[in-house]
Amino acid sequence: MAQLKQILQEMGSVIIAFSGGVDSAFLFKVASDVLGAAALGVTARSPAVPRNDLRDVEAFVKQFALNHEFIETQEVKSRQYRCNPTDRCYFCKEELFSRLHQLRKERGIAHLVDGSNAEDVGDYRPGARAARRQGVRSPLQEAGLTKDDIRALSRELGLPTWNKPAAACLASRFPYGTPISAEKLRKIDRCEDRLRQLGVRQVRLRHHDTIARIELLPEDFEIVLRHRDEITDFLKKEGYTYITLDLQGFRSGSLNLSLIHISEPTRPY
């Protein structure tokens, strides 16, 4: 923690790309403690961001009276993003970081930072390339903090995010190569929101054309089975023909499994 505070102190002023997740929430709170109003958290609003995540962001900011703003991002207007290639995240993060970089210059803020931690090297992360391109710094990574470290320190600080489940944008519900649209993203958001209303804690509704594949924690299977007819009716009204429950349960990044032996594509960025 001391090293992180020193890094932030030396930065002087920062914009934090704040998603509301464990890492960026911890970074935002510590940066605010160290820098006061010179720490500005900024959250993107777009069809790809779950409404549930935005509600969590608003609650966190209100609880700790933090300096925060929302911005609208337009990644869904990008043809490259909508085509949903394996490096889709690059185009999303490029849009986000370029807008934050412009805001940073307009406000005279010294640095743009994100919540990447010391372990963020395992999954497929083309978005990290966009961060490097835009000169984004990662104080948690620089301080050598792991996810477990961040959860433990968040708990010590009394942050409600200390045990928050992993989250991902709604575009991650589509297999690579399946075209994405704003309406498809909103449909996934509505479906997942409905499942959460029934008491499901962690959910991914994977979109396979006319098939909805629901990933849940195994201990929540019973909830879905109990409300089977209600869920089936709702999802069919949303356009799905077949409603399935994945017996392997919730797996973060499950649609990346086909990429395990694929190296990142090289692009002249």
What do these predicted regions represent?
Residues 164-182:
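Internal, active-site/partner-interface "lid" segment
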Residues 1-156, 197, 212, 230-240, ...:
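ATP-dependent adenylation/nucleotidyltransferase module used to activate substrates
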